[in-house]
């Protein structure tokens, strides 16, 4: 009980030091780096495990009861809805690197928002689970209660109640609301 109090107290201090807008009961682990903290909102019972990077664009919102695993990097305009579980070692970015000018190194060309899917942000729907070593890049919307399998690369929208896997991501299961079962797709 004392350990939890100390963890959440330190989380509140880390929020304040980084300019993050956060509710009560927020845990922010060691070595979490935040850029543009004033654009980050953490709602209640959020856990950000150690060694994560939050590089906020104009808006980064993390909903109630979210758990972000260790060594994750979040970049750009991102909305994570309530009760999302994100495993370790993921790259989640609404932006991509510019590379058009061959006279400059890519690292000196900045970033852009690809808008391949017609959205203004990357969104992860309520109750979803993102496995480990996943890359989600662009203005992707992941639906509610989705599972993104380990080692998957997502660059397109994922509908509600789906399991996706692979490079590039493809739907392998979908929840059938009528039969109340997960069905494999061919």
PLM feature spans:
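Extended, small-residue-rich solenoid/repeat segments and analogous flexible loops
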Residues: 1-41, 45
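A general secondary-structure boundary signal
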Residues: 24-25, 64, 69, 160-161
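Flexible, glycine/small-residue-enriched loop-and-beta-strand segment within the central core
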Residues: 35-42, 47-138, 167-168, 174-176
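Glycine-centered loop/turn positions within well-structured domains
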Residues: 60, 152, 160-162, 170
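Conserved catalytic segment of ABC-fold P-loop ATPases
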Residues: 143-146, 159-161
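Short helix N-cap motif at coil->helix boundaries in the Bergerat
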Residues: 156
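Conserved beta-strand-loop-alpha-helix hinge in the C-terminal portion
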Residues: 162-164, 168-184
